[in-house]
């Protein structure tokens, strides 16, 4: 139901733009990568590809019932997204913004594997909220490394993980504070959101770990055998991929570079929940800028739907489905 909220908000905005005479496309995609997808597929005994195919069919059926007017609803597990993710990664690498680092990472000795974000739970290192995953806190929206979790427990085995070294790739976000500030000053952002972003910018802006170790469901990083793009590297690129897919369907593929080049007059707006604000307003704009691609003109952020006083969350089983709600 939380996802339907932002789809409905966007739908209202898009319909207004169309009524006003503006040429407006409504583009979206299913986030199809990451540890939760892999775990769920393993649990029910099907491949991740089959799982995301089934989920997308259900989502499209639900959107039809709510009369959501997407021009294209794609998936991040697509040839277009793989192509664009590799393109952006290579551009960032060419700009000297990708760096290898040896990091300490949680390792499950029972399962003999490194534990990526959703394989581990513990207390948030910022606000002490219980039952938080290893990448970001659903309570305070902080992002962090899984090793920083307090009292970590492996989701897979229930054991206490040990610490081992692994080589990871980092996007040098710490060097790009001025670029983020410049984008923020020239974008349409709600004042409370702007204040939160300025708070983050005044703090310790850290380089961003964009790689994950095998096993992981996602795109392999070019040139690395057992490394995958972290889901939040390729997920927002899915907007561009959905547009490229739309253009291909309409035999307009050559328009992509004209629309998405850094000097394009096209306007781009996002509607998101506040839990993913960090990724959309700090990482994504400078990923695009340093790839010579158009940055968003604005980001509209909504708060959480709650159930029994807690954030509605599908991954935690605390939610009302959009299908049940409409029935």
Where do the model's predicted regions map?
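Structured secondary-structure scaffolds
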Residues: 1-28, 75, 80-84, 127, ...
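N-terminal, positively charged nucleic-acid-binding surface of large information/translation enzymes
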Residues: 1-181
């Amino acid at each position: 139901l939380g996802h339907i909220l932002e789809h409905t908000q966007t739908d209202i905005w898009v319909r207004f733009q169309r009524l006003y005479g503006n040429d407006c496309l409504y583009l979206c995609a299913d986030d199809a990568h990451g540890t939760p997808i892999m775990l769920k597929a393993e649990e029910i005994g099907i491949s991740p590809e089959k799982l995301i195919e089934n989920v997308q069919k259900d989502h499209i059926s639900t959107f039809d019932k709510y009369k959501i007017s997407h021009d294209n609803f794609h998936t991040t597990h697509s040839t277009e997204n793989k192509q664009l993710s590799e393109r952006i990664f290579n551009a960032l690498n060419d700009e000297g913004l990708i760096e290898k680092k040896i990091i300490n990472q949680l390792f499950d000795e029972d399962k003999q594997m490194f534990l990526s974000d959703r394989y581990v739970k513990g207390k948030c290192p910022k606000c002490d909220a219980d039952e938080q995953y290893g990448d970001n806190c659903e309570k305070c929206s902080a992002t962090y490394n899984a090793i920083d979790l307090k009292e970590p427990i492996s989701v897979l085995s229930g054991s206490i993980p040990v610490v081992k070294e692994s080589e990871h790739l980092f996007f040098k976000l710490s060097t790009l504070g001025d670029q983020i500030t410049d984008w923020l000053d020239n974008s349409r952002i709600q004042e409370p959101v702007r204040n939160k972003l300025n708070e983050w910018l005044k703090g310790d802006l850290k380089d961003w770990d964009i790689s994950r170790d095998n096993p992981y469901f996602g795109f392999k990083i070019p040139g690395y055998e057992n490394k995958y793009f972290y889901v939040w590297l390729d997920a927002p690129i899915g907007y561009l991929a959905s547009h490229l897919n739309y253009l291909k369907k309409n035999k307009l593929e050559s328009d992509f570079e004209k629309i998405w080049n850094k000097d394009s007059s096209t306007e781009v707006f996002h509607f998101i929940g506040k839990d993913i604000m960090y990724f959309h307003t700090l990482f994504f704009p400078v990923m695009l800028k340093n790839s010579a691609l158009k940055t968003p003109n604005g980001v509209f952020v909504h708060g959480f739907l709650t159930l029994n006083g807690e954030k509605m969350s599908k991954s935690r089983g605390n939610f009302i489905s959009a299908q049940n709600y409409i029935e």
